[in-house]
Amino acid sequence: MLEAIVQSHESLSKFLAAFRDAFKNRPQYRHFQAYVVGVLIYLGSRNLAGLSRAIPDGRNPCSLYRFVAEMDWDMEQVEHVRWEMLNRRTRRALEAAARHGKPVPVFLAIDDSLVEKTGKQMEAVDYHYSHSAGKTVLGHVWVTGHLIVLGQSYPVGWRLYRRQATCEAMGVPFVSKPELAQAILRAFDPLPGTTTYVLTDSWYPSQDILDECQKRGFHLISAVKSNRKFKATGHNLQVKQWTQILPRKAFGFVTVNASGYQVWSATGRLSSGHWVKLVMNRVIGQERWRYLVTTDLSLTPQTIISHYLARWEVENFYRVAKHSLGWGDYQMRDLFAIERHVQLMMVAHAYLELQRQEALASAADADAHVTLGDIQRQLQSLSRRTEIAQVFHLAQRGFSLETIYQRLAA
């Protein structure tokens, strides 16, 4: 049935075939196909037991475990192919924009997400604070880098964060979240002829991150905490204190994505010595002030806010990855197997993103809206049709119902 599903979807068949050289033999490649297709089409929990049920006459959970935990296939090659396919489409889109003389900002959003777990025996699992739950929960925290450009959106890197106490217990070096973010920035190969804006929340704009951006020729747009020091016009104050000394007439108003903002901006230095533009802003009608800084001093407050809002694409990815692609469904104890599961989940996401871009490019309506969920539901529907067609074909050949059960539902 796996072969029938893959062959009935030409785009899926070509996509999976691009990864063939990462596997030493055909059985490994078949396991890869089964794993990725299972992630894409299964409607239940995408743990090994669920993935084994995703395809009639599918792989045994034990064989899937051996595939991710023991078999010797090239995970780096898999990631290289994933990245090249996504990056190739992005470069083509940038070339088309350049022919029309359109300057295109490229956003590299750094963020982290907590994947809740229940098994305390999982390697590197720990208690982390969950903002959504308002308490500490057991799980893994993943720091990610996400590329956002011309409507395209996909991860460029991800690293598992481990608390310092956990690292000491495991005898491995501790790496902070900003240091993991630095590693992602260092590994990122910028797109030619573009300006890269690194987007972060207030957890990440350390001196090292600012230095790394400056070294790579990137600009930073980041939220900062209200107690961050900002020096301008002879004053060296926490950013929240500027509201207390500014006259009412100092504030302006801008509109971003149909929302009105009250803003004040100034150029000055952070305590690290870096020159930045500070944008103090709040949505009209709300009390809470938010504070953004950027190292691109030429940007207007309106553009800074607009660029920063692109960061919410990452939240959309986290939601899809957890709810529809099984990011948090793994139950393996071994970290090596977990990292391979996440890699294969990223491959499944790449297929959906590439197909989403194809659908948008061929849409008659220039304002068409296509989501990853739309593409995934189409694939799931077509896969069910393939399964039904296979049953019909076997029945036409005279196989009994019991024999069909044994072939497809044993």
Where are these regions (language model features)?
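Gly/serine-rich nucleotide phosphate-binding loop at the start of the catalytic core
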Residues: M1-Q77, R82
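Basic, amphipathic alpha-helical segments enriched in Lys/Arg and hydrophobic/aromatic residues
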Residues: W327-R385
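Short amphipathic alpha-helical "interface-anchor" segments enriched in bulky aromatics
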Residues: L114, T300-M332
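Long, charge-rich low-complexity segments
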Residues: H80-R91, V104, R384-A410
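An internal, acidic/charged active-site-proximal segment
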Residues: A165-M280, E358, S362-I375, L408-A410
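Short, conserved catalytic/metal-binding motifs centered on acidic residues
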Residues: L51, V104-T118, G145, Y197-P205, ...
